[in-house]
Amino acid sequence: LYIFSLFFIFSACQNNTQYSHDQLDSKFGVYISKLSNQEVSGHLSNGLIPIALKDNIDAIGFANTAGSIALKQNFPDKNAFLVQKLIDKGFFIRGKTNLSEWANFRSTSSTSGWSSLGGQTLNPYGLNRNPCGSSSGSAVAVALAMVEVAIGTETNGSISCPSSVNGIVGIKPTVGLVSRSGIIPIS
């Protein structure tokens, strides 16, 4: 099963108003790549809604790396089906979130939330706690209120686990409800 999810803000785990997005990203390892503050301001002034994507989903202007150095130059020529639908509805991509490299398909003993490109994503409730699951960067972005909505993927706990340990709600639509084109899959 390979399922998509929207992570909705449930409650921010910390009062982060004194920190910039860049400071939060630096501390918690949320993004692999992101728009500049100037680009974000332009989109916001046009009334668009920011969204974060797990870095295994195609989005024009961003490399789709699955967190791996091997795919660092993998720039798609079109958006994933899901991404295009979101853009058509008034969203813009704020950035690509860190993930467990290859969506945790490296080893049965690999570390959740670690990739060679993004380093280690940290759990905002406890820096020594597991951020849990390959969609951990997306979950942490929502938990820190860096975005209100983020997209993740799941084969085996990659949405449910980071949602539960980062204090947010993860929704998994029925398999087949949303096209999986433009996604680097593990199943």
Each predicted region: which residue ranges?
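Short, well-ordered alpha-helical
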Residues: 13-75, 79-80, 98-104
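Short glycine/serine-rich loop segments
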Residues: 80, 87-187
